[in-house]
């Protein structure tokens, strides 16, 4: 599937807010508030640098939170998981809010049940698993960096053999 360029104005803003004093002091005493989950979730297969994931669900499928809905397509790619449980209402190119380009997306109608896949919240004693197993779990989870490029973390953890770190 190829992305289609569409005429759009990307939403952006200038500057932002930069408090001169300790910015955390402005909110550290504030109460935390939970946000509501969306009725419809648009999950793009390109949430990272590199090849977009390939959707592995289809219209009409019932998915659970944490379920793999997009499979990485190469080493520099990342798996995508459902952030809500519900019914897949469509899989199609949709206007990406960041890039302004139509990109493959899985659209899920939230059932409002917050049903997770089995094993999603299991933890392991990290002292008992090998570095390769940790790297494999990071890759399976689709973890990416938050530095702006959303680079797949497993790639960063796999330097060339001759590279001294």
Predicted regions and their residues:
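Well-ordered secondary-structure scaffolds
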Residues: 1-165
């Amino acid at each position: 599937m190829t992305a289609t360029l569409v005429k759009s104005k990307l939403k952006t803003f200038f500057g932002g807010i930069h408090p001169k004093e300790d910015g955390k002091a402005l909110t550290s005493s504030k109460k935390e508030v939970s946000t509501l989950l969306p009725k419809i979730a648009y999950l793009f297969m390109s949430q990272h640098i590199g090849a977009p994931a390939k959707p592995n669900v289809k219209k009409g499928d019932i998915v659970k939170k944490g379920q793999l809905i997009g499979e990485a397509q190469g080493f520099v790619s990342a798996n995508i998981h459902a952030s809500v449980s519900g019914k897949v209402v469509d899989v199609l190119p949709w206007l990406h809010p960041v890039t302004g380009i139509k990109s493959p997306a899985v659209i899920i109608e939230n059932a409002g049940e917050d049903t997770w896949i089995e094993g999603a919240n299991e933890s392991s004693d990290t002292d008992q698993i090998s570095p390769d197993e940790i790297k494999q779990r990071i890759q399976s989870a689709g973890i990416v960096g938050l530095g702006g490029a959303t680079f797949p973390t497993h790639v960063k953890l796999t330097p060339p053999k001759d590279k001294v770190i």
